[in-house]
Amino acid sequence: MTAKAVSAAFNAALAAEGGSVPTWLILNALRHDRWTAQLDLARELGIESPTLTRHLDNLEEHGLVVRRQSETDRRAVRVELTEAGEEAHQQMLTAVIAFNRRLQAGIGRDELRQLDAVLDRLAENVAR
């Protein structure tokens, strides 16, 4: 229930800036690695290549990314963030920071560390 509420609020925060969770994840990944191979990006984000292709089509249509054939490997496609993509990322980053502040209001550092530790253990348990 909490996960749904947090997810819905995060989606709303991004939507207010014209974004979405997939858009944020892609732009944020590209922001930290200015360009990357499309296949590597799909792996990094943990999504199937056809799903990423659909999202990239939309982002490219809006001028936020460009795709180019690799100069060294004709089979590989590089994805690059455009200037408009940088600006969109910055707008969404501002919304993400504000969302995180709102989410963590009234929760101390020790409580957040404890929450992180519990969530890490849950993830480890699921991976078994």
Q: Predicted segments — roles?
A:
Residues 124-128:
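Short, charged, intrinsically disordered terminal tails
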Residues 35, 39, 57-120:
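Charged, amphipathic alpha-helical coiled-coil/dimerization segments
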Residues 4-51, 62:
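N-terminal helix-turn-helix DNA-binding core of bacterial DNA-binding proteins
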Residues 1-4, 15-18, 76-78, 92:
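Short amphipathic alpha-helical segments, especially helix-boundary/capping motifs
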